[in-house]
Amino acid sequence: STMTPFPHYQYTESFAKERDALDPLADFRSRFHFPKINGKDALYFCGNSLGLQPKTAASYLEKELAAWATMGVDGYFHGEDPWYSVRKKSKPILAQILGALPEEVVAMNYLSVNLHLLMVSFYQPTPTRFKIIVEGGAFPSDQYMLETQIKFHGLDPNDVLVELLPRTGEFTLRTEDIVEEIRKQGSSLAMVNMAGIQYYTGQLFDIQAITQAAHEVGAVAGFDLAHAAGNAPLHLHDWDVDFATW
């Protein structure tokens, strides 16, 4: 999908403030702590690395620390929010955000750990089907993970990874170019492993089209949704995505 630009777009401070005033989510700004620079709230554009702290975060942490202090190990099964049941309570919430069924999601571990676990299950290279398509400039942790998993199978990342780059003079990938590369790799392609949103350019990929193209050549499609979950509409179940983490 493409966004229609404002017909009267202006590169001016007054126009930016006008759009901010009309933003239905503008009030959410007041719910976060901002670092101060020269006594003023910083203009914060590092959410892709570490988001701003919600003002409610400290109270939630204090609540659980108090439960730990007063109940110790009994906190797993007793109290207002027993820790053991947290994962079950989170399932329907996560499922709604991801467009998945509750039985298809679980809250566990850390992003890179989950990527490794998913690769162990879904990356099963053969002598003829072993290639992995990834967007060029992927998040560094994802690159390290892929190289580690490829070497685990005794393969050379230079022989396995197919990095997608924008056309000359462009900054984002065209969906038709991604699909074309998938079809080009064909029976040698084992997996498409991409982000949902490219952390550096902010490009939202067409997950459905990419997944469909991968399946058409017999490959699996998985996505790192660290920057997409809760940030863009997702319908992972309907799109038939093989695996994802965030």
Predicted regions mapped to residue ranges:
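Pyridoxal 5′-phosphate
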Residues: 2-246
